[in-house]
């Protein structure tokens, strides 16, 4: 790790500390993720190293680039391109003010492009949330930590014992489904889309059952009619309260009808009926010309404050 000089600690991710660091030779700024794993004495599993090495091949403008993997003794460092802010911090730094709809549209389109690319390479994220969506002053948004779940699993708690958020977790996972599909990421994107519009988390649950019930209260309790096979999922209970669905107009009143339609398709209960990232990119919501220079200008102003 002598190549890198740590500049400052910038956060604590799911798997370990993240540092802003500088390449001593080139001066390039990088994000250095130190992976802390509760491992047996042998150190880092070779399967994890294999999985992670594959991620270096994921090259896309909306994916945070994994530049290098440095593995010594029982430590694993992942070297990523550096971006100065995540979407959560960005939204928290502009409380009360709404994000312009053109910026939301631009961010959503870019997120779907990144997710579509990863899904086409058979990589599922499984833990998308505003904290791992990184933005820069040029109006770009990039997905971080893609593929780490497959290498390391998604723990219930971070290495500092914080609970890993459930707010963006798909209902099939909450109901105990053992089979993950790319649809779990689409659900998360739906939650993030709504949060960008309303500036409030859509389903801020504090336990798995609270998380499920918040979803049911808003979208109605699922049944075999709305989600064939739901009653067979391991954690489904016939005794769940029966809530009826609310209209999306109540939830995202200031979103245009095409946006509401797309949100509805992102938040489909049945994973097999949930829209894919690729199909979502062709949705009429995106057909109006994208004023990205305006989006860029807006972000730039915010970065200067």
From Swiss-Prot:
PANTHER family assigned: CELL DIVISION PROTEIN KINASE (PTHR24056), CYCLIN-DEPENDENT KINASE 3 (PTHR24056:SF462)
InterPro entries registered for this protein in UniProt: CDK, Kinase-like_dom_sf, Prot_kinase_dom, Protein_kinase_ATP_BS, Ser/Thr_kinase_AS
Active-site residues annotated for this sequence: 127 (proton acceptor)
Record-level Gene Ontology MF annotations: ATP binding; cyclin binding; cyclin-dependent protein serine/threonine kinase activity; protein serine kinase activity
Entry protein name: Cyclin-dependent kinase 3
Organism of this sequence: Homo sapiens
Keyword tRNA processing belongs to the record: no
EC class (word): transferase
Gene Ontology BP annotations: cell division; cell population proliferation; DNA damage response; G0 to G1 transition; G1/S transition of mitotic cell cycle; negative regulation of Notch signaling pathway; regulation of G2/M transition of mitotic cell cycle; regulation of gene expression
Upper lineage: Eukaryota, Metazoa, Chordata, Craniata, Vertebrata
A single cellular component GO annotation: nucleus
Entries under Pfam families matching the protein: Pkinase
Cell division keyword on record: yes
Keywords: ATP-binding, Cell cycle, Cell division, Kinase, Mitosis, Nucleotide-binding, Serine/threonine-protein kinase, Transferase
Database matches in SMART domains: S_TKc (SM00220)
């Amino acid at each position: 790790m002598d190549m890198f000089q740590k500049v400052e600690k910038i956060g604590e991710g799911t798997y370990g500390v993240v540092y802003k660091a500088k390449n001593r030779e080139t001066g390039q700024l990088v994000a250095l993720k130190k992976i802390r794993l509760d491992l047996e004495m042998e150190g880092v599993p070779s399967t994890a190293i294999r999985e992670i090495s594959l991620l270096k091949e994921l090259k896309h403008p909306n994916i945070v680039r994994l530049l290098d993997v440095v593995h010594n003794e029982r430590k694993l460092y992942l070297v990523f391109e550096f971006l100065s802010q995540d979407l959560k911090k960005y939204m928290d730094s502009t409380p009360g003010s709404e994000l312009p709809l053109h910026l939301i549209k631009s961010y959503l389109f870019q997120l779907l492009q990144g997710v579509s690319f990863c899904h086409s390479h058979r990589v599922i994220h499984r833990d998308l949330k505003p904290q791992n969506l990184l933005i820069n002053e040029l109006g770009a948004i990039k997905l971080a930590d893609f593929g780490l779940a497959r290498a390391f699993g998604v723990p219930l708690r971070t290495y500092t014992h914080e609970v890993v958020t459930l707010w963006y977790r798909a209902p099939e996972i909450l109901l105990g489904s053992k089979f993950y599909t790319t649809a779990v990421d689409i659900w998360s994107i739906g939650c993030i889309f709504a949060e960008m519009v309303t500036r409030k988390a859509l389903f801020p649950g504090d336990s798995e059952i609270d998380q499920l019930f918040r979803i049911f209260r808003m979208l109605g309790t699922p049944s075999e009619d709305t989600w064939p096979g739901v009653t067979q999922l391991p954690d489904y209970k016939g005794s769940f309260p029966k809530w009826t669905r609310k209209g999306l107009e109540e939830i995202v009143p200031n979103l245009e009808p095409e946006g509401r339609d797309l949100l509805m398709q992102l938040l489909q209960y049945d994973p097999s009926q949930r829209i894919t990232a690729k199909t979502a990119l062709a949705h009429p919501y995106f057909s109006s010309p994208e004023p990205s220079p305006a989006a860029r200008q807006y972000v730039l102003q915010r970065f200067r404050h």
